[in-house]
Design a protein with these regions (language model features):
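Glycine-rich, flexible N-terminal cofactor/catalytic loop recognition
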Residues: 2-64, 164, 273-278, 286, ...
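A contiguous loop/helix-start segment that scaffolds small-molecule binding in enzyme catalytic cores
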Residues: 9-11, 87-89, 153-314
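Short, acidic/turn-prone active-site loops that include or flank metal/cofactor-
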Residues: 18-19, 43-45, 61-68, 123-125, ...
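Short, well-ordered beta-strand core segments
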Residues: 36-38, 58, 136, 172, ...
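A cross-family phosphate/adenosyl-ligand binding-site feature
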Residues: 43-46, 50-82, 99, 302-307, ...
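Ligand-binding beta-strand-loop-alpha-helix segment within the catalytic cores
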Residues: 82-85, 102-104
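Ligand-binding face of N-terminal immunoglobulin V-set domains in extracellular IgSF glycoproteins
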Residues: 92
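Class I SAM-dependent methyltransferase SAM-binding "motif I" and its flanking Rossmann-like core
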Residues: 96-168, 286-300, 308-314
Length: 315
């Protein structure tokens, strides 16, 4: 093996994108493929983990509403522990790790322990969601700037968000703001006094994507009738989401949840073909690969939890 080809100890802080596996960057894919250990978030598409080697260790460190979560301090400690005992560690996060992904805390820990690292950007939810609406976050003559903000603060504090961008005809993208939506919409009404268009995109780019549109004065009522656990939602406020097409709001289509059974390398190609047309996919290679115990256990749990509408056997 040449010096350039040798794999050195390193931690990659990788953005997995918004959910559709076809939106994973090539760099992120290469990091996953060479990882010895993957620490992954709840929002990561399960199929993306299956791009890894069968002998890679998977560790779930996700923060999930309504359930116990892994504290950030524990995640930081795991990064150090695994980096000191393995060659390549991937910290796999939904979206872009540098946008509300607490990447600075993990970087500070790695620097403190002199562990080499690299941040690998991913497609963030706001831009992915707008692509699904057939719109841009900015629009000439309508919105010339964009603000990303979060509705979820440290220690669950309910801090005010900066509405300056709306006062200046910009676009506001609110991450993790569904629980605080009534309060946030009320703040816009009181401080700005304009009934802006609003769109909320749940599970953007995934097969179970769901879009709800309205205005600042109506959107809370419209999402109140939805099931409690719709999945992650990004809220877009501003004139860029005015007059959305009916096809965007109700796309129709017969999307399936597909289980592909077979050896991983071969199954990945088939799974990608289904994912590219909007279907949810998972690989079951437990009988074909010498899997790391964490992989076998995780795949078995996913299969038990998911309802598949189609199974494809490659044997």
């Amino acid at each position: 093996m040449s010096a350039l080809a040798e794999v050195q100890t390193k931690v990659y802080l990788v953005g997995a994108g918004p959910g559709n596996p076809c939106l994973l960057t090539k760099k992120a894919e290469r990091c996953i493929q060479k990882a010895d250990v993957i620490l992954y978030d709840q929002l990561v598409n399960p199929f993306l983990l299956q791009l890894s080697r069968p002998d890679a260790e998977w560790i779930h460190v996700g923060k999930t509403p309504y359930t116990r979560t892994t504290k950030q301090e524990r995640i930081n400690a795991l990064l150090v522990e695994k980096a000191q005992s393995a060659q390549v560690v991937v910290r796999l996060k939904g979206g872009d790790p540098a946008i509300f992904g607490r990447v600075t805390e993990e970087v500070d820990t790695l620097r403190e322990h002199r562990i080499p690292f690299e941040i690998v950007p991913g497609v963030t939810a706001a831009s992915a969601a707008m692509s699904q609406l057939g719109r841009g976050l900015t629009e000439r003559g309508v919105s010339t700037h964009i603000t990303f903000t979060t509705g979820h603060f440290k220690n669950n504090e309910e801090n005010d968000i900066d509405l300056t961008t709306l006062a200046n005809d910009g676009t506001l993208a609110i991450y993790m703001g569904i629980k605080r939506l009534p309060e946030l919409m009320q703040a816009i009404q009181q401080q700005i006094g304009i009934d802006f268009p609003v769109a909320i995109i749940f599970n953007a780019t995934r097969s179970d994507q769901h879009v709800v549109s309205g205005t600042v004065s109506t959107i809370v009522e419209r999402i109140a009738v939805l099931p409690e656990r719709m999945g992650p939602g990004i809220t877009i406020v501003g004139h860029v989401v005015r007059d959305l097409d009916e096809a965007v709001l109700h796309p129709g289509g017969d999307f399936e949840t597909v289980l592909v059974k077979g050896e991983r390398h071969q199954a990945i190609e088939v799974a990608y073909e289904w994912a590219e047309t909007g279907h949810a996919v998972l690989i079951d290679d437990r009988g074909w690969s010498d899997l790391h115990p964490t992989q076998a256990e995780t795949i078995a749990r996913w299969i038990d939890e998911m309802t598949f509408t189609r199974e494809i056997s490659l044997t």
